[in-house]
């Protein structure tokens, strides 16, 4: 909706598919649990780096697995209303994102010349005010779990998965950190030639595995129409929430720019 959290919804659906494949269990996991923990980790890293890090709503696939690995996971039905403690039924994070960025930016200025022991608690309290509280324990099919023990029951293991990519500014057949702002955790991806990357993906799908695909939805040629347009005319990347980048602001019609006839370099 009006948030920059598409990365969490898409990556968590991949995790749910993997659980169905490996355990035969259908689960609906809490996206906002992951988002809340991600905010916290991001704030700590932002402060450690004196503000020299992207602090925004966007993130990447690996963030979801990192959060599950570090904090566990909670079913959606035990967090109904969590993440929406501010009067809307869908994520609307513009105010929250601005408040959190303002808070960590003030902390980075270090007015006391040393960090207090209270700053992270203050950050947590802002997130809790907007999101609500997470249950410490919950019961599924008669068994009581914590977020960590539920993760272990589901068998989600970060080390079971690998990122692959295809860029020409790094050597092939080696891992590297993809230099984009949303990769704030500095996860590495194994670099393959484009045709080999596609071959790996098709092979995985043919064998019954799920693929999580990461793309930049802020690019002007990105649409829901099942194609990618690379116009000769260069335009500025779209700003705003994921929803606005996909289909325009809620009050607007879908973006007419991508429907306009322009000279094209390539249509895929």
Name each model-derived stretch.
Residues 1-268:
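Catalytic-core signature of thiol
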